[in-house]
Amino acid sequence: PLQLTDLPFIYREPGSATRRAMEEFIHAQGWSVRKRMELTSNEAVKQAVIAGLGCSVMPLIGIKKELADGDLKIIPVKGLPVTTSWNLIWLQGKQFSPAAAAYLQHLRSSKHTVIGNRFRWMESYFNQASP
């Protein structure tokens, strides 16, 4: 039977956080994969996968519609999904406008609610990995 490592892989460009997460995952699995191409955006990678040019590791947030529409599917693999942390950053000493300060306060006070409302749909994909 066809193995995942037999498929060509589509990568993001060097320096991309998506590529770094993908390479760390592949290395942790001990896989040797064939790189088919490198593209400069998650959208380009997604469209290449939809076109049948290979497979990839992608952020769930970028493929929500395609998963719902059935255009893409997730292959359950132990170790996936890879989780990463994001941070809100700004220039040190920056004076915020009143609107920016209010938005930052909203994010700080409501982050768990915002995350729950916007990203809860992802939870169904976190337990799909094969044993």
Label the model's feature ranges.
Residues 28, 60-69, 79-131:
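C-terminal effector-binding regulatory domain of bacterial HTH transcription factors
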Residues 5-6, 49, 82-84:
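Residue-level preference for short coil/turn positions at secondary-structure junctions
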Residues 20-74:
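Hydrophobic hinge/microswitch elements
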Residues 1-9, 14:
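Flexible hinge/capping segments at coil-to-helix
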Residues 14, 18, 37, 92-96:
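Residue-level signature of the cytosolic catalytic core of signaling kinases
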